[in-house]
Design a protein with these regions (language model features):
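N-terminal Rossmann-like NAD(P)+-binding domain of SDR-like oxidoreductases, especially those catalyzing
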Residues: 1-184, 204
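Glycine/proline-rich active-site loop of Rossmann-fold NAD(P)-dependent oxidoreductases
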Residues: 159, 177, 184-197, 204-206, ...
Length: 213
C-alpha cells in the first residue's frame, strides 16, 4: 500500500481529491492542513465520511514552518505528495498581500525541502493556477512555456512557488509535476470563491467585479 501526502485536504479542491483517493485507491493518505478560515474546519471532510476510514490520517500543521521531526517520523516512507494547500482568494491578496504571499511561497518551499529528503518519492504534484499567465489577448491560446504575467498578488505567489518547484526539479532531480488549473466549481465550495460570488451577486442585482485586463 502506497503512502501519500495531501496538503490542504480540508479545502475545496483538496477534499474532492481526498474523496477520489478514498473511492478509487487503496492508498494510505496523510492529510496536512492548518485549518484556515477557508477550510471550513473539518466540515467538508466530515461530509464525505472520512473519519470512518482508517486509511486516512489527519494532521493540523502550518506548512509556513518546517515540518517537525515528530511528524516526519510518523509520515514515514511517502510515495506521492499532492501539494494543494494555498490561500486563493484574489481580493484578500489585493487587500493584504504580504501574509498572503508569504503563506503560499513559504508553505511550498517547506514541503519541497521535506520532499527532497524522501528516498522513494515517485511524484510531487503542485497545483498552481492559469492566472500566472495573465489575461490572454483575443484569439490567443497560452501554452505552458509562456512568460508569466501575473495580474495580482495571488497569481504572483503561485508563480513564485512554481519557480521554486522548477528549481528543485532542476537542482535536485525531483520528479515534480505542475498543473495550472482554471476556476473550479462544485459541492461545498466557499461562498467567497469567484464563481459562487458572481452567481450570488447576479441573483442579488449587485455589481460584479472581475480582476482582469
Amino acid at each position: 500500500m502506497k503512502k501519500v501526502i495531501l496538503t490542504g485536504a480540508n479545502g475545496f479542491v483538496g477534499h474532492h481529491i481526498l474523496e477520489h483517493f478514498i473511492k478509487h485507491t487503496d492508498w494510505e493518505i496523510y492529510c496536512l492542513d492548518k485549518l484556515s478560515y477557508a477550510s471550513s474546519g473539518h466540515d467538508r471532510i466530515r461530509d464525505i465520511d472520512v473519519f470512518n476510514d482508517e486509511r486516512v490520517k489527519i494532521f493540523t500543521t502550518d506548512l509556513c514552518l518546517p515540518l517537525q521531526q515528530g511528524l516526519i517520523k510518523e509520515l514515514g516512507d511517502i510515495s506521492y505528495i499532492f501539494h494543494v494547500a494555498a490561500d486563493s482568494h484574489v481580493d484578500n491578496s489585493i487587500s493584504d498581500p504580504v501574509p498572503f504571499v508569504q503563506n503560499n511561497v513559504n508553505s511550498t518551499l517547506h514541503i519541497l525541502e521535506y520532499a527532497r529528503q524522501l528516498p522513494n518519492l515517485e511524484k510531487f504534484i503542485y497545483f498552481s493556477t492559469d492566472e500566472v499567465y495573465g489575461s490572454a489577448p483575443v484569439g490567443k491560446n497560452y501554452s505552458e512555456g509562456e512568460r508569466f504575467n501575473c495580474g495580482n498578488p495571488y497569481s504572483a505567489s503561485k508563480g513564485a512557488a512554481e519557480c521554486i518547484c522548477q528549481s528543485y526539479a532542476n537542482t535536485y532531480g525531483m520528479p515534480i509535476i505542475i498543473t495550472n488549473t482554471m476556476n473550479v466549481i462544485g459541492e461545498r465550495q466557499h461562498p467567497e470563491k469567484f464563481i459562487p460570488k458572481v452567481i450570488k451577486k447576479i441573483l442579488n442585482g449587485e455589481t460584479v467585479t472581475i480582476h482582469s485586463n
